[in-house]
Regions:
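Structural signature of tandem-repeat unit edges
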Residues: 1-7, 17-32, 42-57, 67-82, ...
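Consensus positions within tandem repeat domains that build extended binding/scaffold surfaces
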Residues: 9-14, 34-39, 59-64, 84-89, ...
Length: 200
């Protein structure tokens, strides 16, 4: 994509299931990716948005059921404020999500990474504005591997974890929350069989 691109509108590439690669390396002015923009692009394998330094929002269902997508990199997206509902739901091959240095990110909407059954790594370092993890955001991520690096303690602004946000997920090890947490929703961590301790 060229540097001048500012918006990818809804359903722009929806259903392009032979699309295997998207080059965002020059898209430094891109501000938004719309609803269902890359919906069911099942051939897509890697998504590197780290050069998209102007990106503010990703719409609902934007990358829904991109079933061969393995890695998502948001590490340079310092202006990103929200990732919409169902944006990456059913990305069943997704293993790593890098949200490090997304310092403006406030909300992970409902079911955003739900049913990503191979998810093993979510990088959150620098997500200092994240206040809400929505309903079902990471539920049903029951991979054979363990999601052991999800560090709640560095989410210093986090207040609300929604209903079923991590139910039946691969969260593992010790869970420690920062002092600002005020609400854990119904069934927020139900079925997390590999959690060994919780520290409030």
């Amino acid at each position: 994509f060229p540097k001048a691109l500012e918006m990818i509108d809804q359903e722009a590439f929806s259903g392009c299931n032979t699309l295997t690669e998207i080059d965002f390396s020059k898209a430094t002015q891109l501000r938004s990716i719309g609803h269902r923009a890359f919906y069911e692009c099942s051939g897509l394998r890697d998504l590197d948005l780290s050069a998209c330094t102007s990106l503010v929002g990703i719409g609902s269902n934007a990358f829904y059921r991109c079933s061969n997508l393995q890695a998502v990199n948001f590490s340079g997206c310092g202006k990103l404020t929200s990732i919409g509902s169902y944006a990456f739901q059913y990305c069943s091959s997704l293993r790593t999500v890098d949200l490090s240095n997304c310092s403006a990110l406030v909300t992970l909407e409902s079911y955003v990474f739900s049913d990503c059954s191979n998810l093993t790594s979510v990088g959150l370092a620098g997500c200092t504005a994240l206040t809400t993890i929505g309903e079902g955001a990471f539920n049903n991520n029951y991979s054979s591997s363990q999601l052991s690096d999800f560090d709640f303690s560095q989410l210093t602004a986090l207040k609300d974890i929604g209903e079923s946000a991590f139910s039946n997920s691969a969260l593992a090890g010790d869970i420690a929350f920062a002092s600002g947490i005020t609400q854990l929703g119904r069934n927020a961590f139900s079925g997390c069989r590999n959690i060994t301790s919780v520290d409030f």
